[in-house]
Amino acid sequence: GTTEGFRRVKEKRPDLICLAGEPQEDPNVISSVADMSVIEDFISRGYLIVHTAKKMGAKKFVHISFPRHMSYESISRRAAIMQQACKDLGMKYIFETAPDPTSDVGVAGAQQFMLEKVPAWVKKYGKDTAFFTTNSSLHEPLLRQLAKFGGYYVEATSASPIVGYPGAFNIDLSKEAGDWPAILKKVEKAVIKAGGAGRMGTWAYSHGYANTLALVYLG
C-alpha cells in the first residue's frame, strides 16, 4: 500500500518528498512514485548468508517463509539466489512453510508454530543445518529453539542485534538504547549464556536504524 499512499500524497502535495525505507513493494513499482527508495542489497545477501552459514559449519540451509512474502520480488529473488548458492557451495537447500503472522492465527499463533516445529526440523535435518526466516516476528522463537536444540542462525531478514535476540533471551536493553557497541556486547553475552556461541550471528548495527537516519539526512 505504500506505492498507492505515496501516489495519493503526490496528487495533493507534489512538493512533499516521499522516501521509502525497506519497502515491501517490488523495486520498480515503488521507485515509480518515491523520490528515493532504499533497501538492503538482497541480491548479495542471498549469496553471503549461505556462504557465511557454510563458514560457520552448516551443511544444510532451511529457508522459512509463506506465500505472501514469496510473492515479493526482493524476497523471492533472494531465495532463488540462496538456492543456487547452496548448489554452488555443496549445501542442501530446503524450503519450509510457516504461518503468515498477518493471517487469522496472528503473531502468537505463528510464533507457537515455530516453537513446536523448530525442534522437529532440527531433528529431521540435523544440527549442522542453518535456519533463515523472512518474517521478523518469527526470529524470536527460532532463536530460542535453536539455542536449545542446535542448528545455526546467520542473521535476521532485517539484520539487527535487536531483532529476535532481546525477546528470545530476555535481554533488557533500555540502558543501552542507541549505543550499538554496548547493545551488541550485551546480546553476545546473552547468546553465549544460552549456548549459542559460534552458531548465531547478526549485524553490528541495526539496518533499519541506519536506513532511517540515512533517509532523513538525504531527504
Regions inferred by a protein language model and the residue ranges of each:
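Periplasmic-binding protein-like
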Residues: 1, 16-21, 62-65, 125-136, ...
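Solvent-exposed loop/turn segments at secondary-structure junctions
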Residues: 2-4, 23-27, 67-71, 100-103, ...
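Extracellular/periplasmic periplasmic-binding protein-like sensory domains
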Residues: 85-93, 140-219
